[in-house]
A protein has these predicted regions:
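Mixed-charge (Asp/Glu-Lys/Arg
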Residues: 1-193
Length: 193
């Protein structure tokens, strides 16, 4: 009977392992996701600790990496011009400058509420703008998020968590330390075998 008791947990463990088994590719993807989430959290902490001037440069770098704006000099002139009726800057939506996106960048710790967004939208109306992006290191209240869903002009809200994710995705402030190449059999090569 003692032997049977020791066999049962082993059998249960083996069965449990089979049920929860992931393919090596799935394990690699899950680990990659955990690494990127941890990296994004570290990036956000560093962004929040940085100066407002650094945050403005970061916004320029990120938008350029995302394909907005023309040159670094053009984008740099567009950001950080405070005191312009609630608009921190403008940047071209594309390299040709066919459309303009108005920006508000706030390095805040707390939540940005609907009143702040309404001020920004009012400033956009004053410029007859069709598009705006409000970027913060903090978060947005549910009222702010709900408000922008049904208004014209189109306003995109980017909170601190999303800023960090975009920085990781577009390689702003991060560097690649290792690359893994996952390979499979090339069926075409063996087609005539």
């Amino acid at each position: 009977k003692a032997k049977r008791q020791t066999d049962e947990p082993t059998t249960q463990l083996a069965t449990s392992e089979v049920v929860n088994a992931e393919t090596p590719e799935e394990e690699l993807e899950a680990a990659h996701g955990r690494i990127e989430a941890s990296l994004a959290a570290e990036v956000l902490a560093r962004v929040k600790a940085a100066s407002p001037a650094f945050f403005e440069r970061l916004v320029v770098d990120l938008l350029l990496k995302m394909g907005y704006g023309g040159s670094r000099a053009d984008a740099g002139q567009a950001i950080g011009k405070g005191g312009d009726e609630g608009i921190d800057g403008v940047i071209s939506e594309d390299r040709l400058g066919l459309d303009i996106v108005y920006l508000q960048a706030k390095r805040w710790e707390g939540s940005v509420g609907r009143p702040e967004i309404q001020k920004f939208v009012g400033a956009l109306h004053g410029k007859r703008a069709r598009k705006g992006v409000f970027i913060t290191t903090g978060s947005f209240t549910s009222e702010a998020t709900a408000y922008v869903e049904h208004i014209d002009p189109k306003v995109v809200l980017i909170d601190g968590r999303r800023v960090a994710e975009l920085m990781v995705d577009f390689e702003v402030g991060v560097t690649t330390i290792r690359t893994f190449h996952v390979k499979r059999v090339d069926s075409d090569y063996f087609e005539e075998a």
